[in-house]
Structure formats: C-alpha cells, structure tokens
C-alpha cells in the first residue's frame, strides 16, 4: 500500500504493483534489494531515497549523482550474455559507457561541449527529447526497454532503438539538431482500431443499403 501511495504522486523504482517486467525485477533483485549498487541507482535516475532514522522515522535523502533522464556516452561495450551485462553494471563507468548484448553498428563516439540532449515533455505514452550533436552519437535513456509497443522516431521518421544496460533504452543519433520521440503504439491496439473502424464502415453500409430502398419505396407509395 505504501508503494502504491508513493507511486500515485511520484515515479518510483518499485512501481505501484508487485508484478514487474522480468528484467526490471532481476535488476531490482540483483542491485537494489540487499546490496545497493550506486551505479544502478544513478542510471535509474533515482534522485531521492527514504532512509530510516534511529528513532524509526523516515527522512528523505537527496542523490546528487543521478544521471538524469538521458545522457550521451562515449563507448558501447559488447557483453557476452545478459548475465555478464547485469553483473558489469556495478563496476563500469555507466555515465561514459553503455553495456549491451545487441548488435550496434558503432561503438566509439566523440563528445564535445556542444553535444547535448534533454527531455522536453513527458506523458505516459509519449516522451519527447531535443538534442544537438556534432557527430554521430549514442544516447542512453533512463526508461525501461519494452519492444512490444514503444516505437522511436527522429524528426518524425521511425528508427530502431536498442536495449542497453540490461534494461534501458539506447539510440544512435546522427549529427545535427533533432527531435526524438518515443511513443507507445502497440500493434494489437492499432489492429483493434482498424477492425473497429472497418466494423463501423460495414454497419454504415448496411444501414444505407437497408434504409435507402425503404425510403424510395415510401416515396413511390
């Protein structure tokens, strides 16, 4: 109940429900349950923590090292397996490097003082970012990777994104100034909408075919 109450007002790692996606649950169990990994806390952009004082009261602690909603990395490290990836989260410099088992065409990136990326709007089903980079870059987003519905777009054109750091999203960005959009558009919902629209069309056609002849018949009478 406490988790649900907190989640009503704030984004929380635990979420509002005990059931979590498999990788998020594994991440929680491996790095946030018994032993807390600062690296994982920071990449999940955990800005505040609740700490129990000696008298049993709760106090809020601020984490100044949180990475933010999104950041650019200099290197992508290829991991041999998901187990290798989740284990290395505790030791790698995740602010500069991203871990993955995906096949990404480029793994080294040059960053300069002009390269930047930031979140500009946030909705439950849509995230919008603005970025300016001098050369091809790679961004890590502090959002769960979920391929069954989340689609990514650069300047309105759909592009592929990747799973990095075991459970987060990553995206290759071409040089220049761009608008990046993540939108939740599950194919099953799109199919349902098309079927519903087709149903409306068929129903309308039946109405026309049934009532128009009746109207003409009435006029003849």
Could you tell me what each predicted segment is?
Residues 1-130, 136-143, 150:
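Conserved luminal/periplasmic juxtamembrane motif of membrane-embedded glycan-processing enzymes
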């Amino acid at each position: 109940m406490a988790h649900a109450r907190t989640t009503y007002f704030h984004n929380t790692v635990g979420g509002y429900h005990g059931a979590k996606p498999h990788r998020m649950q594994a991440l929680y169990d491996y790095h946030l349950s018994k032993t807390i990994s600062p690296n994982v806390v920071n990449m999940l952009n955990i800005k505040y923590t609740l700490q129990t004082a000696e008298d049993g009261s709760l106090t809020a602690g601020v984490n100044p090292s949180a990475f933010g909603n999104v950041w650019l990395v200099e290197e992508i490290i290829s991991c041999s397996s998901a187990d290798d990836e989740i284990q290395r989260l505790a030791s790698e410099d995740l602010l500069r490097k991203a871990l993955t088992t995906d096949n990404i065409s480029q793994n080294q990136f040059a960053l300069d003082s002009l390269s930047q990326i930031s979140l500009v709007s946030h909705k439950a089903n849509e995230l919008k970012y603005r970025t300016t980079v001098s050369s091809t870059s790679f961004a890590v987003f502090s959002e769960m990777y979920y391929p069954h519905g989340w689609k990514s777009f650069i300047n309105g054109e759909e592009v592929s994104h990747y799973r990095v750091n075991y459970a987060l999203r990553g995206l290759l960005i071409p040089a220049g100034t761009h608008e990046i959009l993540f939108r939740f558009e599950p194919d099953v919902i799109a199919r349902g909408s098309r079927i519903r629209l087709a149903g409306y069309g068929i129903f309308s056609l039946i109405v026309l075919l049934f009532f128009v002849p009746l109207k003409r018949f009435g006029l003849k009478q």
